[in-house]
């Protein structure tokens, strides 16, 4: 292919109760930091991730204890579980046997053809997809010898090599990732991959860093990739609590209009005109709307003179003034409220609008089901 395969045209692949690919929908993924064999700790972390908005979660499976824990973990969580396997095909077989929803393994790295075939047959029997994880830092020796150093072309060649192994065994439930720590390399690799095949792509900038630096780096790289219509799932990799990865991912998707079930906050950068503690109010409102599953736009602005007009695209908002606030909807002032109660008044209106949106969505789903 010479053209980029847009995410909506990728091959649909089932992962648990989700369909990855074949639509414009992206799913947010994270990875547990716990030892997988510690079921209690792993389940507790996954439940926190679920609450934050994680839709797929990966766990490391370095040994048999981890593989054995999968069945119990699956019973206690509500999102698809992915097993991260390196080299040992027996761990992949055990993970599949114990009900894993997807396996991340590079077929070229697990040995003889019979081993690959065993994993593929087990995955086929249970409808389990395989994610091929290409990483610039661990390309095959023959590719590094050919290109001299990690390149986008080398990464695509590696992906095609692993894809061919699976396709030769008539296996096509494939997802591919093309991760690199270098932002420009990752952008180029994903773009070339989207031109080379139509399998769904999992996005990530690997080893991106700590919470602040990693957020900036991931947003820069993944934002460029998303803007090209590439990507079906994504993970923000941070050296931080994995819940922070979900928060960043949600904001990134909202920035590109790719989140149909998340609320958005609009707030001004503050200036000498403000008469309220806008920063703390904005943080409070942002936290309040973070659990909403509707596309509500909320504004918190410091200036009652320009505020409502500047945020007319917001569904609801407040603009501060001396001793009072203006509550507005779609740029039009609804009423004045005392400063000490304006946040609570805003929250009440948010709850009303969110409930209306939920009711409307439910009615549309019923209508769609009956059509």
Curated annotation (Swiss-Prot):
Keywords, ordered alphabetically: 4Fe-4S, Iron, Iron-sulfur, Isoprene biosynthesis, Metal-binding, Oxidoreductase
Disulfide pairings: none
Cofactor note: Binds 1 [4Fe-4S] cluster.
Secretion signal span: none
Catalytic activity: (2E)-4-hydroxy-3-methylbut-2-enyl diphosphate + oxidized [flavodoxin] + H2O + 2 H(+) = 2-C-methyl-D-erythritol 2,4-cyclic diphosphate + reduced [flavodoxin]
Enzyme class label: oxidoreductase
Pathway the protein acts in: Isoprenoid biosynthesis; isopentenyl diphosphate biosynthesis via DXP pathway; isopentenyl diphosphate from 1-deoxy-D-xylulose 5-phosphate: step 5/6
Family: Belongs to the IspG family.
Functional note: Converts 2C-methyl-D-erythritol 2,4-cyclodiphosphate (ME-2,4cPP) into 1-hydroxy-2-methyl-2-(E)-butenyl 4-diphosphate.
The name this protein goes by in its record: 4-hydroxy-3-methylbut-2-en-1-yl diphosphate synthase (flavodoxin)
Organism: Lysinibacillus sphaericus (strain C3-41)
């Amino acid at each position: 292919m010479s053209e980029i395969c847009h995410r909506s045209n990728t091959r649909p692949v089932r992962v648990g109760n989700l369909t990855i690919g074949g639509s414009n929908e992206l799913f947010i993924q994270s990875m547990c930091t716990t030892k997988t064999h510690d079921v209690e700790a792993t389940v507790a972390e996954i439940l926190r991730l679920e609450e934050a908005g994680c839709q797929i979660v990966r766990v490391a499976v370095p040994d048999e204890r981890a593989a054995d824990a999968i069945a119990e973990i699956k019973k206690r969580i509500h999102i698809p579980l992915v097993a991260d396997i390196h080299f040992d095909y027996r761990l992949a077989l055990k993970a599949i046997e114990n009900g894993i929803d997807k396996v991340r393994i590079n077929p070229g790295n697990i040995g003889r053809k019979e081993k690959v075939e065993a994993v593929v047959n087990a995955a086929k029997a249970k409808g389990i997809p395989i994610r091929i994880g290409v990483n610039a830092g661990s390309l095959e020796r023959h590719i590094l010898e050919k290109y001299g150093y990690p390149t986008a072309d080398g990464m695509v060649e590696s992906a095609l090599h692993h894809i061919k192994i699976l396709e030769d065994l008539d296996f096509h439930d494939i997802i591919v990732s093309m991760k690199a720590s270098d932002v420009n390399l990752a952008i180029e690799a994903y773009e070339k991959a989207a031109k080379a095949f139509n399998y769904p792509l999992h996005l990530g900038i690997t080893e991106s860093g700590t919470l602040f630096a990693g957020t900036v780096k991931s947003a820069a790289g993944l934002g460029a990739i998303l803007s090209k219509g590439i990507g079906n799932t994504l993970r923000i990799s941070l050296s931080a609590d994995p819940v922070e990865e979900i928060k960043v991912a949600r904001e990134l998707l909202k920035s590109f209009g790719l989140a149909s079930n998340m609320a958005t906050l609009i707030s001004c950068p503050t200036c000498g005109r403000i008469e309220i503690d806008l920063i703390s109010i904005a943080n409070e409102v942002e936290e309040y709307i973070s659990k909403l599953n509707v596309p509500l736009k909320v504004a918190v602005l410091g200036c009652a003179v320009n505020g409502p007009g500047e945020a007319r695209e917001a569904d609801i908002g407040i603009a501060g003034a001396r001793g009072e606030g203006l509550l507005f909807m779609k740029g039009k002032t609804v009423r004045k409220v005392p400063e000490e109660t304006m946040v609570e008044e805003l929250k009440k209106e948010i709850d009303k609008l969110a409930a209306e949106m939920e009711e409307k969505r439910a009615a549309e789903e019923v209508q769609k089901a009956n059509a």
